[in-house]
Amino acid sequence: MKNEANIAFYNTSPKYEILMAVLIGIGICLTRLATAVSQIALAIATILAAYLWWKNGKRLNLNDAARQYIKVVCMWFIASFVSIIDVDNKAVVFYYFLGDWIWRFMVFVLVVAFINRREYLLKILTVFFCIFSIDCLIACYQFFLLHWERGRGFHGDYLDLTAIICMVLAMSAIILLDSHFEKNIKKFALLGLVSSIAGLFGCFGRGAFLVSALVAPFYLYYYLRNSKKMAAIILIILCLLGGAVLSSPKYVERLSTTLNTTTNRSNVDRIWTWKASWDMFKDHPVNGVGLNNWGWYYRNAGYKYDEEKQNLPHAHSNYMQLLAETGIIGFFGLLCFYGFSLIISFRRWIKHHNPLDLIFFTAFLSVMVLFGFFQPTYRLSSVLRVLWFILALTIQLRESIFIGEKYEKQL
């Protein structure tokens, strides 16, 4: 049976499956540690994928869930791309769309089309947990020992890492709490959970604390009501974390400004950019000002309010940025994409209690819906690649889960 599965891999040698898994794994795991290496690995994987697609009669081997989700994402992409119709810089918008939208989504396509073996998926996840943990620990070192204003991890904006933390924290907790996962991956999930919590403190981000707190009830309620012992352990951990926060004036002061919309400059300026985005939408309601054109219109077309003092480069919101850039058409596509991602996964979770559906739901809710409220996460390269990987991972692993039984490895 194993040999039959190997031969069936796009009518080529089974070695290609291993090579694809290695390349995709490098591309995902090194997206923050070594961006250039990550990009090269994904480019080679994409070229190899084109060869395998051609070798397989110009067909991709996709399960129904992956095929359906790709269609939904493409509908959102097309609705957003309509914004190119009446812009002056069509070439620039087209290049941005290919580079920042299509290219990043290739991570999802590569995983669902070319990594079917459970062991390969879990090995990639294991390496990801390890590198992610180093990223978080570096952020702690930067914040606590080097006394940086905020820890950033390997590189980039600190918000990149905090957005990823929100996803990984929920995913790690679900893997640990669910009885079906193997002990080996649970060990690395524990590493991911501890590192995520440390990263929350090291990155010193208000949004990450808020998002993590809002998402936690979705997975804690189900697991804790079925285990008094686990409920007691989690309660103790939460009390310790709460005590650590409350005992530190620095964290209390920082978190107390989360909802301050009157005197906190960061929050106030965000609101002014949202007002500017609304003005852009009112002037270009159908298909917006064009993808990635928000910054030019904000600086040069009179939309910036004098009250906004930081000269922010974007609208600090998935919703307001895309409303301004893609208009009603693109925003409707965004809402359909959000609705499908949340409703379908949550329905499946309620019906089957499949932990992979819950991971899908919490990852999307964390990054795109909640974190995206105050940061345009769809623009963040490393964040999007990790999100697409986690969503693809859940779809692929779901095929090997049988409710009420232990996992069965795919051959």
Predicted segments with their positions:
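Membrane-interface catalytic loops of GT-C/OST-like multi-pass glycosylation enzymes that act
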Residues: A91-V92, E149, G153-Y158, C203-A208, ...
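Membrane-embedded alpha-helical segments of multi-pass membrane proteins
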Residues: A36-K55, L98-V109, D160-L169, L210-P217, ...
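Long extracytoplasmic/lumenal interhelical loops at the membrane interface
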Residues: T261-K275, N287-T326
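Transmembrane alpha-helices of multi-pass inner-membrane enzymes
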Residues: A21, I44-A50, I174, F337, ...
